[in-house]
Regions:
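Acidic, low-complexity intrinsically disordered regions
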Residues: 1-211
Length: 211
């Protein structure tokens, strides 16, 4: 069993990429439904606020994302989205029977801008939370950022440069993002180590087309 947590930016700066984000996410989920193994899916959409649209749903029961859920507005309260999700999933694991705790937990964080609106969590708190979950429980975190220095921003969250990548925030870049995310999720679900070149295709795209 794998715990999958998607933290998706829907702030105002994502305007114009709604259809690409929805299509990319749905294609990724469809591919995961064809892969072997069980998974639980949580999806958090964030702008000024965080909205949980899937709360540990069995993968087979995850409905398609639509424009009713994914629409752009507001600012970027990324720390609140990440901190709230870690707290929620961590508490469930803490009080669950050992046999009910998923063997693997993977967070995928996608943002096209810097944090600018959180009021419940700060960098230090979230960094400590992430470091604890990585070191004590082996959780994995991937950070995909556009229009920012993704490695530097990920470091502020306690996520290493090898788990962060800059992507091109356009139609092609968004589609590629979800293809690469799907490949990474497949590796984690198959209990294969996430290789250092998991992000190679995104890096090559940015080198070719720029940020």
């Amino acid at each position: 069993m794998t715990e999958l947590v998607f933290i998706l930016d829907r702030s105002g700066s994502m305007s114009g990429l709604e259809a690409d984000t929805i299509g990319g996410f749905n294609s990724m989920i469809a591919r995961q439904k064809q892969a072997a193994g069980e998974a639980l899916v949580s999806t958090v959409l964030f702008d000024n606020d965080s909205t949980v649209i899937h709360d540990r749903l069995p993968l087979s029961e995850v409905p398609p994302l639509t424009e009713k859920e994914y629409f752009t507005r507001g600012c970027t309260a990324l720390l609140d989205a990440v901190g709230g999700a870690i707290h929620h999933i961590g508490n469930i694991h803490k009080y669950a029977r050992r046999e009910d705790v998923p063997e693997k937990t993977l967070f995928i964080i996608t943002t096209d801008g810097y944090e600018n609106a959180s009021c419940r969590y700060n960098y230090e708190t979230v960094r400590r939370m992430i470091q604890r979950q990585k070191e004590k429980y082996g959780w994995e975190f991937l950070f995909l950022g556009a229009n920012i220095d993704a490695a530097r921003e990920a470091a502020r969250f306690g996520i290493g440069a090898d788990r962060s990548v800059n992507y091109k925030c356009d139609e092609a870049g968004t589609a590629l993002n979800y293809e690469v995310i799907s490949e990474a999720v497949c590796s984690v679900r198959a209990a294969r180590p996430l290789s250092a070149d998991w992000k190679r295709r995104i890096d090559e795209d940015v080198q070719k087309r720029g940020r």
